[in-house]
Each structure stands twice: as structure tokens, then as C-alpha cells.
């Protein structure tokens, strides 16, 4: 609902609900992995997308192109075994992140979550890279840790009032750790996600465990977490 101006993935500051124009442009251009939102860069020109960004902002009467408050990245910390180990400790310390994402980052903690509308939500399984809404790059993960996700239970860990607040350096360490969890997942190969029909003579087996199916080429059925519930 563009009239609510509820933009979850943005690069503006923690207390700034309005996104940068580039944030909206990126979502239209690249889409959102793990959702029904496709990328339009193969269909719309760059100017078309810019025009669409300006049009979408009208619904919520957004005038700023680049709000004053922006994310403070400080000095980016490159991923390393030491940084990942430090992020691992911070992730689990006081159940800072594991309270929702689970001890192994699989989103399997028992805490029941609801978004601001009261709908049931599920924490991200951080070991499945194809479900990340933006990307698995540490810089994008740092943004989520810093700003939180508007309208959801994902908080900002840059909030000075939070008992679980992280410094800029600590946020980079957690981002590197989370990126390492994503890298441990097995990506789905795009060429294996299309079901290719093969013409056969005679009848097909009626039972799913029939040995005749062993001769069929395997296909990956690409499932995405599009769950809505209360």
C-alpha cells in the first residue's frame, strides 16, 4: 500500500521513515528475491524506472529525494575469521539475534512474532541465501541491522535506547557473521528450476514410489517463503 509509505528496505537513517529515491529505484529495477516482486530492468528503461519512482511517491506525498538523515557506515570492516568470530559472539550474546533467528540462524526460535498490522511473521532463515530480500552482501545486511525493518519485529540495533544496541564496528562484525551463514547455504541453480516435460509412450506409473520414476531427470522445485497468517 504505497499510501502508507511503509518502506521496509531503505538506506536512510534509523529514525527516518522516508526512503531515498535510489532505494525505491533499486527495488523496481532488481525486484525482491524470495517474493512475487520481479525485477523490471529488462522491460523498463532507466528513465522509465525513475519516472515510476517519482509517481509512486505521490501516493504518500513524499517530496524528499534524499532525506537528511542517512545511515552512518563508519569504516567498513572486511570479512575475516576474526570478524566472523566476533560477530558470532555478539549474535548470541544475551540472545541478541538468536532470540528470533535461532541459535544456528535458521529462524527456528520459538518466539511468536507479529508485524504492526497484527499478522503473523517468521524470522528469516539466515542460512538460505535465496530468501534474503535485498542481498547477502555484508553492506546490505549492515543496513538491516542498523535501521531494522519498518513495520516488523526486526528492530534497529543502532537505537541508543536499546539494551541490545551495537556500535558501528559491532554491526559490521555481525553483518560479516550473518553473511557467512548465507554463504554456507546451498544455492538453487536457476537452470534446475524449470520443469521440462518429456513425451513418453504408454501410460505413466500411478504410484509415486514406482521404480520407473528413477529414470526421470531430477528437477529442483524452487519454493519461496510467501507466508501470511495470524
Each language-model region and where it sits:
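Extracytoplasmic electron-transfer domains, predominantly the class I c-type cytochrome c fold
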Residues: 1-57, 113-179
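A residue-level signal for beta-strand positions that form part of recognition/binding surfaces
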Residues: 97, 123, 194
Amino acid at each position: 500500500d504505497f499510501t502508507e509509505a511503509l518502506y521496509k528496505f531503505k538506506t536512510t537513517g534509523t529514525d527516518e521513515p522516508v526512503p531515498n529515491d535510489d532505494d525505491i529505484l533499486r527495488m523496481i529495477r532488481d525486484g525482491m528475491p524470495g517474493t512475487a516482486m520481479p525485477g523490471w530492468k529488462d522491460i523498463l528503461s532507466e528513465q522509465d524506472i525513475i519516472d515510476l519512482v517519482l509517481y509512486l511517491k505521490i501516493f504518500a506525498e513524499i517530496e524528499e529525494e534524499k532525506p537528511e538523515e542517512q545511515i552512518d557506515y563508519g569504516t567498513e570492516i572486511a570479512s575475516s575469521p576474526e570478524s566472523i568470530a566476533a560477530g558470532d559472539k555478539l549474535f548470541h550474546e544475551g540472545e541478541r539475534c538468536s532470540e528470533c533467528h535461532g541459535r544456528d540462524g535458521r529462524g527456528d526460535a520459538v518466539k511468536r512474532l507479529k508485524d504492526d498490522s497484527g499478522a503473523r511473521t517468521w524470522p528469516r532463515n539466515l542460512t538460505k541465501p535465496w530468501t534474503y530480500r535485498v542481498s547477502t552482501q555484508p553492506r546490505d545486511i549492515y543496513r538491516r541491522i542498523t535501521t531494522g525493518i519498518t513495520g516488523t519485529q526486526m528492530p534497529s540495533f543502532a537505537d541508543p535506547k536499546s539494551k541490545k544496541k551495537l556500535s558501528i564496528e559491532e554491526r559490521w562484525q555481525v553483518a560479516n557473521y550473518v553473511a557467512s551463514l548465507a554463504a554456507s547455504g546451498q544455492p538453487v541453480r536457476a537452470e534446475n528450476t524449470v520443469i521440462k516435460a518429456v513425451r513418453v509412450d504408454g501410460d505413466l506409473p500411478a504410484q509415486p514410489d514406482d521404480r520407473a520414476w528413477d529414470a526421470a531427470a531430477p528437477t529442483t522445485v524452487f519454493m519461496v517463503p510467501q507466508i501470511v497468517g495470524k
